[in-house]
Structure formats: C-alpha cells, structure tokens
C-alpha cells in the first residue's frame, strides 16, 4: 500500500500530541529549575560572546542594518563586530511576501546590485486594479501617484533576495548565524538591554532535560537591533518593558501560493490587485497576483490579505483565499498550472499612527518589528531596509562619539532621523487610508475617502483617524454572527488546509516544549469555544488548533494544539480574543522551509 506524504503529515500531526500515553494540548507545568529535581545535576551556566552590535532576525531590515554597519566601519577603518541570528534553518527560509518592491533602499545600500547578481530582474510591465463582484469585475484606473501604482518597480521572490542579502552581509564581514533562535532578552543591572540569549536545546515536551541537552548561549552587545518581523517574540517584550507604544497596532494575515502556470497564459511583469469579493463590504482586505519569470519558469505569485480586525468569528482567512481563486478572472490564469508553494504571515497594517518609540537603552526596533509596512502600497521591503540602514548609521555615530569602550548605546537619533526620511513621510501621507475603511460607511466609505483625500490631496488633511480597539477585541459572539458557507476544495484549483501546509516544509523537533503556550487551559473552552465558536480553529492558516472530542467524555470538547504544523505566522498571538495564546520561540531551525516565497 502506498502512503502519500500528505497522509503521513496528517497522522503525524495527531500523534505528536501524545506524551507518555497522555494527550497534551500546549505546555507542561512550568517549574523553577532550581527546585525541580530533574534539573538538580544539570549545569545551567551559559557561554557568552561579545559583539558591538547583535541583530535579531535575518530579514531585509536586519541584514541591511548589518551591511550598513560594516560599510561604515570599513570607511572609518574601525573594527566593528556585528552578528545576525536567525531562527530559520537557512537565511530566507522564513521569508514570505508578495512581493513587488521599490529598489530605492537597495540602490542606496548596494548601488551595483545588478552587477553583483541580485535576484531582482522582473520589472513590472503592466498592471491593473479591480473591484470584484461574485462573477464580475469593475476596473479601477491606475492613476499616476496612487499608492498601488507600480511603474518602475520589480516583482521578486523575496526569500531569494534575502538569501542574497545574507551572502552580501557575510562578504562584508558580518557573522551570520542561521538556525539560532533568540529566546530571551538580557538586561544589565540598570535595566538597559545587554543582549540576547539563544534557546536551550534538548528539553523534552514534559520539561525535563534530555541526554542531548545543551544550554543556550548569551550574545552581549553595545546595542541590540530587533528585526524579527511582525509581532516578533522579543520585540513584543521590549515594547512592553519600555512602554514604547502609544497607539495600538492593527494587523492583517497574508496568505500566498506560488504557481507554475501554462506558458501560454504567462504575462511576465503583469501585476494585479483586487478588492471586494469574496469579502463582505465591512471587511478590509484584498488580493495580489504577480506574473514573474524565474530562470525560465512561468510563475505566478497569488495571495490574499485579510485584515485581522474582522468581527465575524466564522470568517476563515484560508478559505476566503481559496474561494477568491474560483473567480472567473482569477481561475482562468491558474487553470492548467501546478501549485508549488504555500505559506502565510501576519503583517502590520497600523501605519503612521502605530509607529512606536523606536529606541531604548541598549537597543532599537527596525522593519516590521517597528511597523513600517505601507499597507496602502502593499509594500514594506524598501521601508524595512531603509530603517535598518538609518538605525545602523545612528548606532555607529554613537559608538564613534562615545568611544569603543562604551557599554550601552541608546540610539536616540535613530527616531528623529527615520522621521526625516521617505519612510515616515510616505506613511504619514497614507495614514488615513486604512482606518477610513472602518468608518460607518464601511468599504465604500473607505474608497471614497481615499479617492478624495489621497489622490487629490496626498494626505494633507489636518486630522489623523484612529484604529479603535485592538484586533482581538473586535470579535462578536458567534450567536450574533452570520454563518459563512465555503465550497469544498476540488484538489485542482482549491485545496484542503493540510495539503497546503505540507507544501511549507514546516517541521519542529517533536519532543520539545510546545511553543504555543496557554496562560489558562480553560479559556479556550469557557470563552473561545463557548462564546466565539472556537475562532482559533479558523484563523490559523496551518491547522494548528482543533476542537476535538474529549477522551474522558466524548460529549465534550478539548483543544488540541498541533504545534508541529505551525508556520510562525503569529496570527494566533494577535487575534486570540483573551490574549491567552502566547507564541514563544521554539528550538532554532524549526518552522517553515520556504523556498523563494
């Protein structure tokens, strides 16, 4: 009998929740290691290393910061030790984006990027914007200067660009460490950030040390740059500790597939964005579809973004994406093709209003850890890179002024300097587009507002709209919500969830403490399921959360957490109604293995 890889994935996803014959949901009882007899004879001392700058996260912002630091050091003929730690098994392995990029930051950072062979070669040749109805399509003119106009931009596979940036960083003298998960922020006695510690390895799911236990390592630095991306685990901690955020962030979830399509249907350089169907008029979101030729392959990046401030707990972002692909204008481009990739990632949609204070004693936030995505443009790579570069310049200036013996850098000029760049200026100009869709006029009101105040005024209005309540506070009880009917997948154009997850390559060491932790085990049943119908089973794009019959009483439910499936999108950490789910760092190397996503 032949067993498919997807079948094995389904079975193993269930069995991984059995420990010593007992079903587990999420976490073991945390015990103080000093009083836990299982740890009595274990050496818990950590080795440490000292750098000038430690960067957490090997994405566009972190790598740009690293490269810029080394460029400045070389120009000044100064020794400067810089390292990047990245939790993915390879640089670019956790990167997922559309992506159409502006090259302005890349032009500045590495002017000869074309000669160096950067995987940035598919220029936008044509584009369209439309509002979809269930079977129709209403074209929207692409006026020069509107946020979604893409003349002069490039379609890329961002994971490949990030991999290339990693190579440039190493060539510049940066120490780049993939498969290293930063799990803890270290502090000096005065409360300033001292650096980070990496995760321990070799701990069983029950919290006991295994034979191969190895203590994590400490990385100390004058300044630590947090470049973890949207809703970073450590970034979230420093935001709270230093009280950096004044206004709440609002988020979206972006889901993406990569297709190899019929060459006869391929239009290299074509970019398409849509709004409307299948989402309701009171729901913010939309789609992207990009034709890119990559080494002769006729590829299409197709994706769907759903704002996470939605109210209906029955909404399923993954199924909305699958439904979108059945639209006649979309399906005709994909039919006859083969899907070769899938993934999802939360993204920042707060914009200008939600930018936090960016610096603090011993560190700073860059890229999507700070929230520099321009949701009106559906672009953030250029802003992420530029923020990393500006942070690097501020840090290097401080080291130069205060001397190499300085212990802690608080790069205060970074906050001011970034606000003088195009990064914050373009976010300010588009600041009211996203929240305008949350007015009483809904979707139509947002379109009208954007047309009047941005297209003709470029954001000059003297007011700034707010985002209102946090995303997790906006769900309504399931008894008050409209049911949503989703068609069954056909296995050709639309797919079931676990088949999709199998394309992510996601994997975690099975016998390790689950990284999806619950503050209270009863909240999923007493609140999430009882009041909201169990929304975590729908908003997760990887099938991590399931409500299944309890073994003790089949008339009752229990929450099963398939942590092995997790693709590190962070949606659960954002949308869980009671903020009861806390995403923590698993062992390094775990998670998805995206290839050029």
Swiss-Prot record:
The gene is let-721. Binds 1 [4Fe-4S] cluster. It comes from Caenorhabditis elegans. Its cofactor is [4Fe-4S] cluster; FAD. This is Electron transfer flavoprotein-ubiquinone oxidoreductase, mitochondrial. SUPFAM superfamilies: 4Fe-4S ferredoxins, FAD-linked reductases, C-terminal domain, FAD/NAD(P)-binding domain. Residues 557-586 form the 4Fe-4S ferredoxin-type domain. It comes from the Eukaryota. InterPro entries: 4Fe4S_Fe-S-bd, ETF-QO, ETF-QO/FixC_UQ-bd, ETF-QO/FixX_C, FAD/NAD-bd_sf. The lineage of its organism: Eukaryota, Metazoa, Ecdysozoa, Nematoda, Chromadorea. It is found in: Mitochondrion inner membrane.
